[in-house]
Amino acid sequence: MAAKDVKFGNDARVKMLRGVNVLADAVKVTLGPKGRNVVLDKSFGAPTITKDGVSVAREIELEDKFENMGAQMVKEVASKANDTAGDGTTTATVLAQAIITEGLKAVAAGMNPMDLKRGIDKAVTAAVEELKALSVPCSDSKAIAQVGTISANSDETVGKLIAEAMDKVGKEGVITVEDGTGLQDELDVVEGMQFDRGYLSPYFINKPETGAVELESPFILLADKKISNIREMLPVLEAVAKAGKPLLIIAEDVEGEALATLVVNTMRGIVKVAAVKAPGFGDRRKAMLQDIATLTGGTVISEEIGMELEKATLEDLGQAKRVVINKDTTTIIDGVGEEAAIQGRVAQIRQQIEEATSDYDREKLQERVAKLAGGVAVIKVGAATEVEMKEKKARVEDALHATRAAVEEGVVAGGGVALIRVASKLADLRGQNEEQNVGIKVALRAMEAPLRQIVLNCGEEPSVVANTVKAGDGNYGYNAATEEYGNMIDMGILDPTKVTRSALQYAASVAGLMITTECMVTDLPKNDAADLGAAGGMGGMGGMGGMM
């Protein structure tokens, strides 16, 4: 086991604080509408330019192991805020630095660290309740666009795109961000249910100009099995041909004689048919077939529940207004399923989302909800260079997370104003002893830090602006983009409540742990020079030549 280097008390805390400051100082220059960029060197390819706090934090690794421990603990604050709310990483880092700095001063002055931590925790718990009281719902497109704009560093086009996407696919819809091909940002919306399976034979194509299969008002046969024998399908095919409508077959697979017969029938114009594989694998495929059945008002033909394909009737088939099938995707538009059944299915999947343990499962379930309840929107980010594309894509993703958080828990006045108002409301909060009172003051003073940093990044004097904002009330604050005072909500400067709350809670959590640290242990660096010196002694063997 390697030897350890151990530091105690003030020595440990000073080193830790130094690491915290290096990381926080690098991250906090990005805060606010006039925040600066940070350039990150990459081992290959062009450097990355970013204003995303968590991207900067993730790159920082310090040589001194004690300092690095401090930096890594604050990095955890940024990562946690990012995982929970998707934004607010820089705010969380600024708050953590402020609480740690003030808290360690109090510890150095002889205060009891445990009581300080209790005071900080008490202030933060009260502050979270006050934030919830200040929060207003965010439901209209204008507010959503404003939140997106602020989070994307005052880029109005991004805010409007996200609001438009949410309008089109609903609050439950899936919105993804991809690289665009041009200079302009674009929004693509897929209506209806789309899954990533294309036609099984190009002979089904009836729109050669687009290379697609389009079926108007088709019947939809859903089978949880491989179909290779055409005799199984004859009763259904005859019934569909009599009804004079097209047929879409979604099955585990359609192969051999069955596929060949379907192709021949289609080419001769006897019945218009297309076949695709069912999406997903294993249990997920069964679940997705059931989703499609609910959406189209059909029944999944499955031998597990005693249903046979030969006995299927038109009543077992689903229906939709239109189906479009490409080489890689199938889109079902306007299924005729009952709204109550669809909502019941959505509620069932939501329950599974709450119980899911892995992020992958949760994401796949969320996609299924979106396909049933809303739709899928794709924001294609346009940029002139790859470096700009990466930076802009990160901003759009941040803005998307922020708007989702805003819809979930509402919004408060932005620009650090909400925390200032919360701190002033808690001015009379008291703990059980004087040291807890100091902890409360540490937390309340730290709540001014985000506003001060935003102002500092503008090149203004933080104390002057902070005192002016504190003298006002309600949503009165400082708009750093235009450098004027006014009602933040009227000016469209909004922060999602969830983002502000998460930033404060995670900052206080890690800061409390660091304030109560009394000892730090790390590996001693290996002395490579000594090892090499020992090996070098073997060179003397060359003298053995004299023995002849």
From Swiss-Prot:
It is an enzyme of class 5 (isomerase). GO terms for cellular component: cytoplasm. Its EC number is 5.6.1.7. It holds the Pfam family Cpn60_TCP1. One of its GO terms (molecular function) is ATP-dependent protein folding chaperone. It is found in: Cytoplasm. GO terms for biological process: protein refolding. Disulfide bonds: none annotated. InterPro entries: Chaperonin_Cpn60_CS, Cpn60/GroEL, Cpn60/GroEL/TCP-1, GroEL-like_apical_dom_sf, GROEL-like_equatorial_sf, TCP-1-like_intermed_sf. Keywords: ATP-binding, Chaperone, Cytoplasm, Isomerase, Nucleotide-binding. ATP binds at residues 30-33, 51, 87-91, 415, 479-481, 495. Its main location: cytoplasm. It catalyses: ATP + H2O + a folded polypeptide = ADP + phosphate + an unfolded polypeptide. CDD domains: GroEL (cd03344). Signal peptide: none annotated. Transmembrane segments: none annotated. Belongs to the chaperonin (HSP60) family. Forms a cylinder of 14 subunits composed of two heptameric rings stacked back-to-back. Interacts with the co-chaperonin GroES. Together with its co-chaperonin GroES, plays an essential role in assisting protein folding. The GroEL-GroES system forms a nano-cage that allows encapsulation of the non-native substrate proteins and provides a physical environment optimized to promote and accelerate protein folding. NCBIfam families: GroEL, PRK00013.1, PRK12849.1, PRK12850.1, PRK12851.1. This is Chaperonin GroEL. It comes from Escherichia fergusonii (strain ATCC 35469 / DSM 13698 / CCUG 18766 / IAM 14443 / JCM 21226 / LMG 7866 / NBRC 102419 / NCTC 12128 / CDC 0568-73).
